[in-house]
Design a protein with these regions (language model features):
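P-loop/Walker-type NTP enzyme "switch/lid" segment
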Residues: 5-7, 18, 26-86
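Conserved lysine of the Walker
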Residues: 13
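Short, well-ordered alpha-helices that flank and scaffold nucleotide-derived cofactor binding pockets
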Residues: 18, 22-26, 105, 126-129, ...
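Inter-motif core of Ras-like GTPase G domains
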Residues: 81-85, 94-119, 124
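Short hydrophobic/aromatic beta-strand immediately N-terminal to the Walker A/P-loop
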Residues: 1-3
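Conserved beta-strand segments of the P-loop GTPase G domain that flank and frequently precede/overlap
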Residues: 63-65, 91, 112-116, 141-144
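C-terminal lobe/tail of nucleotide-utilizing enzymes
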Residues: 134-196
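P-loop/Walker A phosphate-binding loop and immediately adjacent motor/lid segment at beta-alpha junctions
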Residues: 74, 81, 126-145
Length: 196
């Protein structure tokens, strides 16, 4: 189970979760763990009920946020972690509260998502620290809405940069360049997860 996380809202965590899922084998499951602002179902184009839906556009399965969360969030994630038959990616909420820490604690690894701007990178570094504090390794980072690789970003975040994803007009995952970048990031992620 991989938590797709970043401290700042609006940096592309949900898009990255779907983009990576589309590029991974075995029709991964993407879980929306953002109880306050659940939008995975809308981006994936599936109903917002409490069961997994196949998302043909991204060749994955999507589990929207169940209405009875957050109390059952950790139970749901623990169950999925044990029972999953394919990669499971958890779209986490922004911030440093309990809602953000729960998926980090349960996951086997974390993928950070950030834009290249300094405040977002600082927040991503805080998320990395939070993951490490609960004993979860940070496997890498994806920078969104940029083709630039800021100097020392791997050192700041304490993990390798899996990829950079360009900005796109309209729906990012409809853009071929964006999909290709997520495919490259997913390949790097698979290399990083062979040790898990």
């Amino acid at each position: 189970m991989l938590a797709i996380a970043g401290g700042k809202g609006g940096v592309g965590k949900t898009t990255t979760a779907l983009g990576l899922a589309a590029a991974l084998p075995d029709r991964p499951l993407v879980v929306d763990a953002d109880c306050d602002m659940p939008n995975l179902h809308a981006l994936a184009g599936v109903p917002a009920d409490e069961r997994p839906h196949v998302c043909p556009a991204h060749d994955c399965r999507v589990l929207p946020t169940p209405e009875d969360r957050p109390d059952s969030l950790d139970q749901c994630l623990e169950r999925l972690r044990v029972e999953a038959d394919a990669h499971t990616l958890v779209d986490t909420p922004a911030g440093a509260g309990v809602d953000a820490a729960t998926p980090l604690r349960i996951a086997d690894g974390v993928v950070l998502v950030s834009t290249a701007c300094a405040p977002a990178l600082r927040d991503a570094a805080k998320t990395a620290s939070m993951a490490r504090a609960v004993g979860t390794p940070v496997l890498g980072a994806v920078l969104t809405r940029t083709l630039a690789r800021p100097p020392n970003v791997a050192e700041l975040l304490g993990c390798p940069l899996l990829g950079v994803v360009p900005d796109a007009a309209g729906r990012p995952l409809d853009d071929r360049r964006v999909r290709e970048r997520y495919e490259a990031a997913a390949a790097a992620l698979l290399d990083a997860t062979t040790s898990l």
